[in-house]
Amino acid sequence: YLKIKDLTDRNNIEIYDKFDWEKVWKENPYLKKNDIKWFLGWLIEDDKKNIVGHIGSLPTQYYYNSIPYNGAVMSCWIVDEKYRHYSMELMRRNIAQKNIDFSIVTSANSKTESALTAFDWRKIPVKKYNEKLHIILNLKKIIDSYLKKKNINTYGLINNIIFYLSYIIFFKRINYWKKFKIKKHVIVYNKFNRKFDNFWNKLKKFNKETFMFNRSSEWINWHLSHQFETNKAIIVAEEQNDEIIGYSICLLKNVDK
């Protein structure tokens, strides 16, 4: 882990600490239930046994027509600039592994996208898969964080002027969400439980022709384990007759930089 951490630090990539990193593998539902040989990833070492390249492979599971399909999520694909000509060999090893039905990448940037396209990978067929919606709760803090991130040094008075101008210009958009009144029975959960499993069983039958990630409580609690344990995620669920009929996972982000 420490050598991989050195590699990610050199390339300005953040990863989990050692405990959470190991937990991702140890608590994976597929690896816990199946006694199979699974490669956690592949490495490139230099002459001094330093790790100069890495690609991880995480087991995942999706459903289609009520049939489970086991796949591998490519993660943490990083290679030092001097050894980037070996990058494709890591990719080749990743997609050639056995015991999987498909491979998927969920966090590709523009550079990764170009490399994947060369291997005939296809984008997820969802038009708005890379769009995000934000609810701004503290405009002043966002403005201050943006100026710090851009290394723009301003005085408090100027920041306040920017804040008030922005608030006036974007008043309707910033306050649009406030007009909605909740009349339904909504409950906030900190983790998935059996109620969500009942909802998932109905969902996969109703949408059986959609390729969907296994949304059982076991899989999602694993997938969001770090966020739940650090209080960075909540589940807002709507219920009728003590049954969940819909929910939304909210990831909390507080940027101070």
Tell what function each PLM region has.
Residues 93-97, 171, 223-226:
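A generic secondary-structure signal
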Residues 50-57, 97-110, 127-131, 154-169:
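A broadly tuned preference for mixed-charge, low-complexity surface segments
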Residues 122-210:
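Acyltransferase donor/substrate-recognition loop-hinge adjacent to the catalytic core
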Residues 1-77, 184-257:
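A conserved beta-strand-loop-helix scaffold within acyl/acetyltransferase catalytic domains
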Residues 63-144, 251-257:
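Acyl-donor binding region in acyl/amide transferases
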